[in-house]
């Protein structure tokens, strides 16, 4: 990496921090505060892309001059509905019931910005769930894992036992597609 540039992750997600570290980059972390609200007619892909870009741009305002800032967001889409982080057990139960025994999409957007340029990508992965019982959903909620996850599950944790198949990027489902993220960062080197 050029010595004049410093990489900054605009996220408090421990999963994104761990995944970015896997790419071998040194980076700092800033915690941008943006409103995550879907506009009424906004398509899922446009929404997740907008959020990743807003996070990166807000992070750029918090970072040192000459920083390169990475923002990312993930949503789960089922029947053209965006499933974000659950607000309650009832919300989580509804999401997991909707995903039960079906295919859905996980969309992760990554935006990398500097004061001179910006590059973004959206990675969509198809995920299939086994049929879930009410008991499995209740036990999973009790584990605490679904609380901070889009779609109310984490493929890298206990929620992985619900997944029968994926087509696409496993790392994108976790929160940061490694290949695509590295390609974006390379644009700034």
Swiss-Prot record:
Main localisation: cytoplasm
Xref: InterPro entries: ITPase-like_fam, Maf-like
- Which reaction is catalysed here? dTTP + H2O = dTMP + diphosphate + H(+); UTP + H2O = UMP + diphosphate + H(+)
Q: Which Pfam families match?
A: Maf (PF02545)
Alphabetic keyword roster = Cytoplasm, Hydrolase, Nucleotide metabolism
Protein name, as recorded: dTTP/UTP pyrophosphatase
Give the EC number(s) under which this enzyme is classified: 3.6.1.9
Q: Which cofactor does it need?
A: a divalent metal cation
Biological processes annotated in GO: nucleotide metabolic process
Where's the active site on this chain? Answer: 73
Site positions for Important for substrate specificity, renumbered to this chain?
Answer: 15, 74, 156
Question: What does this protein do, in the record's words?
Answer: Nucleoside triphosphate pyrophosphatase that hydrolyzes dTTP and UTP. May have a dual role in cell division arrest and in preventing the incorporation of modified nucleotides into cellular nucleic acids.
**Listed NCBIfam families:** maf
Q: Which domain of life is it from?
A: Bacteria
Q: Give the transmembrane region(s).
A: none
